[in-house]
Amino acid sequence: MDPQARPQSSLLTAAPELSPLEQEVLDEYERLSENMKKLAVLLDELASAPATEILDGLRELERKTSLVFTLLKASVYSIVLQQEIDWGGGAGDGH
């Protein structure tokens, strides 16, 4: 890892008794800690949002998911039906 790529706020800035791998692991843990703090803030904001707003968003997501599932089922049915026509009963229909 490039020493200049380390965050300036690092509490353990290149201690001489640490190997480069140990320092890199500590830097990764520090980044993970920062990401967890950001996640906690986002979850707190989400939890403080009105329940009706969250429910409306989930309902919209459910409708979209249902539509995609219906389209997928129709596509699979169409493919299976076409294969049955091509392989079995479709000899006389010009395909």
Swiss-Prot record:
InterPro entries: DASH_Dad3 (IPR013965)
Keywords: Cell cycle, Cell division, Centromere, Chromosome, Chromosome partition, Cytoplasm, Cytoskeleton, Kinetochore, Microtubule, Mitosis, Nucleus
Gene Ontology cellular component terms for the protein in this record: cytoplasm; DASH complex; kinetochore; microtubule; mitotic spindle
Subcellular location: Chromosome, Centromere, Kinetochore; Cytoplasm, Cytoskeleton, Spindle; Nucleus
Biological process (GO), any one: attachment of mitotic spindle microtubules to kinetochore
Protein name: DASH complex subunit DAD3
Function per UniProt: Component of the DASH complex that connects microtubules with kinetochores and couples microtubule depolymerisation to chromosome movement; it is involved in retrieving kinetochores to the spindle poles before their re-orientation on the spindle in early mitosis and allows microtubule depolymerization to pull chromosomes apart and resist detachment during anaphase.
Sequence similarity: Belongs to the DASH complex DAD3 family.
Main location class: nucleus
Quaternary organization: Component of the DASH complex consisting of ASK1, DAD1, DAD2, DAD3, DAD4, DAM1, DUO1, HSK3, SPC19 and SPC34, with a stoichiometry of one copy of each subunit per complex. Multiple DASH complexes oligomerize to form a ring that encircles spindle microtubules and organizes the rod-like NDC80 complexes of the outer kinetochore. DASH complex oligomerization strengthens microtubule attachments. On cytoplasmic microtubules, DASH complexes appear to form patches instead of rings.
MF term (GO), any: microtubule plus-end binding
Highest taxon of the lineage: Eukaryota
